[in-house]
Amino acid sequence: LGDVYKRQDAIHAIAKKHHLVVIEDAAHALGSEYKGKMIGSMSDMTTFSFHPVKPITTGEGGMIVTNDETLYKKLVLFRSHGITRDESQMTRNEGSWFYQQIDLGYNYRMTDIQCALGCTQMKKLDRFIARRREIVERYNEAFADCKNIVTPYQLPDTKSGWHLYIIQVKNKDRKEVFDALRAEGIGVNVHYIPVYYHPYYQEHGYKEVHCPVAEELYTHIISLPIFPKLTDEQQDEVIEKVKDLCIESI
């Protein structure tokens, strides 16, 4: 969540011991690093999201990366109705026009326009991530002396891409702070609501679930604006209003 990586080594050790495939959800972690390695280069498969609020976007959709040729071929089939034109996978070939459906698959292909947008965005990724890190440094420095604000912690051996910047508001009513910031036109949000709070999950056996740490965090968290085109002047305005609300009584 919000690109927080931990226990990677332990996960991969368990997978190796028990001959398991590691499928890594990196929807929030494009451009991040763990122990000097880019996220997406360590697991058997890694998924990324290109939703509009992510570090780069294709409008919607995402990508899966793998270095395993067998998994790659399965993924290519799965995204395209299980259809192939690869002669080595077909039972016969009647010509260059010929194809076969050899497995169950779906229409999970991006459009050409989305792909073109994604390729262009990917070239800008390093610049986007660098700017996000600058914004985080400015937030952290600005809030360092504010006892009512807990800034996000970056684990050792990690370099976050900072998809989100989530603070915890202490000794203040989170909803009042949130509403006051929204009233000032600042696009704050809350990421996320514990899943078992939703009616669907409560109706399917999770009504009595309690995760005290998640519940405690949920009552305090607010996500502040972070995106590459956020100017220093705009960020200073956010910082000023957040500090005013968290230092003084509302």
PLM feature segments, named:
Residues S41-R85, D112:
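Active-site PLP attachment segment
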Residues E24-D25, E60, D112, P225:
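Acidic active-site catalytic centers that drive phospho-/nucleotidyl reactions
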Residues K6-K17, E33, E69-I250:
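PLP-dependent aminotransferase class I/II
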Residues L20-V21:
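Hydrophobic "anchor" residues on beta-strands that sit immediately upstream
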Residues A26, S49-P52, N67, Q121, ...:
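A secondary-structure boundary/capping signal
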Residues E24-T57, K73, W97-I102:
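Conserved active-site segment immediately N-terminal to the catalytic lysine
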Residues L1-Y5:
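Short, small-residue-biased leader/transition segments that mark boundaries at the very start
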